[in-house]
Each structure stands twice: as structure tokens, then as C-alpha cells.
């Protein structure tokens, strides 16, 4: 019999911060706007607020390309305002969840910048960097956003990095224990700030086919959708270890 968790039988409400409530007139929703609506949301019967990404980001994919997991993007407010939101929610017996986007980061993240400067160095192992096939991508996988999942590394004729989504969203290498530990540290840090938990984004994509085998093409571009690999590997023990 499954033990009852605190979130069972709770009402959750997703907030997309950009379009929720603007308090400073710049046309972009912000953290003070969320705070201002807590009483209203409580009156509606909401217990849990799941907030889409507000981390620092170049916003190539609406915040799902994170350049700093420890910072709030200035368009939404400050870290002090985030802490105030958590505090005000707790006063009302409400819980704050944030999106946890760790299948990939932003190409502007410090780790990736260091990886591009030295693909064979320590930070290169934080990502999936592979040699191509005579200058062509290592596999025929298609990204969720179209085109190859592989992008050639500037300055190299035959080295590529993998991105399941946009090229500005390089996939993190979950086979690397150091990467896992750094992400776990980040999760613990946010919990220490008072966050109640996370909604995990794109979790089905973190396990890769390490044989790097081509798939049967499913379109005229000669590529095959990368999500098919996620369906194949969705139950593998290493994926469950991460969760």
C-alpha cells in the first residue's frame, strides 16, 4: 500500500509568470504580482503553486534554457522577492514548486562555456560530446524542435554536442556522477530556501542510447525523432535512480 504524501489530495495551480501579473508596468509578469494574488488563489482552493521557470535565462525557450540555477532572472524580480513569495505562501499554508529543468541547461551556462573552450577537458564531460562521421553528425536523431540533435562545436571539424531541444539547450550528461552531485546540491540549496519541491521537466529524456546507433528514418530529412529513444529507455534503472 502506498504511503500518503503531503501533496496527495492537494489542488495545484500552474503559474506561467510572464503572463500572470505585472506590477511594474513593463508588460511582463513578476514575483510581486504572484504575491499580490496569493489571497485570491487561496480563496479559489489552491494549495500548491507550480511556477514555470524564473531562473536566470537568455529566454530562447521561455526560461527552459537556464544559465544560472541559483539566480532569479531580473525580468521577474530578485532572490529576496522569491524568498518573500515562499514566506507569504507558507503563511497561507500554500506550497511553492518550481520547474526543475535538468535534462539540459543553457548554452550560456558557465559549464557549457568552459566545455566549448576545451571539449576534451573536465567540463566537456558534463555534456554529450562526440566525434562525427567524416564531418557529419554522429547519429541521425532529430530534435524535438526539428533538425539534428547534434550541433558542430565551433573551431572543430568533427566534434559535435547533443541537444534534444534547441541548439542553445545542450543536454547534460547524467552518466557523469559529478554532474549528478552538482544538480543534487542545487536541489538541496533551493529546499534550504524554503521551496516545497519541484516539478521535473523532460525527465524521460535524461537516459540516452549510449550505443549511439542510428534509428530507422521516419521522414524525408533522413532523421528519426529522438523521443523514440526516450520511450525505449523510459524504464531503465539508471533513470529511476535519478528520480
Can you annotate each of these PLM segments?
Residues 232-243:
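Single conserved hydrophobic/aromatic residue that forms the stacking wall/gate
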Amino acid at each position: 500500500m502506498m504511503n500518503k504524501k503531503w501533496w496527495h489530495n492537494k489542488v495545484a495551480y500552474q503559474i506561467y509568470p510572464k503572463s500572470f501579473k505585472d506590477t511594474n508596468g513593463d508588460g511582463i509578469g513578476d514575483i510581486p504580482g504572484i504575491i499580490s494574488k496569493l489571497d485570491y488563489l487561496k480563496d479559489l482552493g489552491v494549495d500548491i503553486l507550480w511556477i514555470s521557470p524564473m531562473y536566470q535565462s537568455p529566454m530562447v525557450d521561455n526560461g527552459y534554457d537556464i544559465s544560472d540555477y541559483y539566480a532569479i532572472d531580473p525580468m521577474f524580480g530578485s532572490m529576496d522577492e522569491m524568498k518573500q513569495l515562499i514566506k507569504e505562501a507558507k503563511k497561507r499554508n500554500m506550497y511553492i514548486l518550481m520547474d526543475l529543468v535538468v535534462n539540459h541547461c543553457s548554452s550560456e551556462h558557465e559549464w557549457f562555456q568552459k566545455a566549448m573552450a576545451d571539449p576534451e577537458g573536465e567540463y566537456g564531460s558534463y555534456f554529450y560530446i562526440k566525434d562525427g562521421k567524416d564531418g557529419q553528425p554522429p547519429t541521425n536523431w532529430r530534435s524535438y524542435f526539428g533538425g539534428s540533435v547534434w550541433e558542430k562545436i565551433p573551431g572543430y571539424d568533427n566534434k559535435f554536442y547533443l541537444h534534444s531541444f534547441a541548439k542553445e539547450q545542450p543536454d547534460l550528461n547524467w552518466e557523469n556522477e559529478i554532474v549528478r552531485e552538482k544538480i543534487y546540491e542545487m536541489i538541496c540549496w533551493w529546499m534550504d530556501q524554503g521551496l516545497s519541491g519541484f516539478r521535473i521537466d523532460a525527465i524521460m529524456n535524461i537516459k540516452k542510447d549510449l550505443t549511439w546507433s542510428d534509428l530507422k528514418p521516419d521522414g524525408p530529412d533522413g532523421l528519426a525523432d529522438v523521443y523514440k529513444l526516450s520511450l525505449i529507455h523510459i524504464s531503465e534503472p539508471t533513470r529511476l535512480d535519478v528520480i
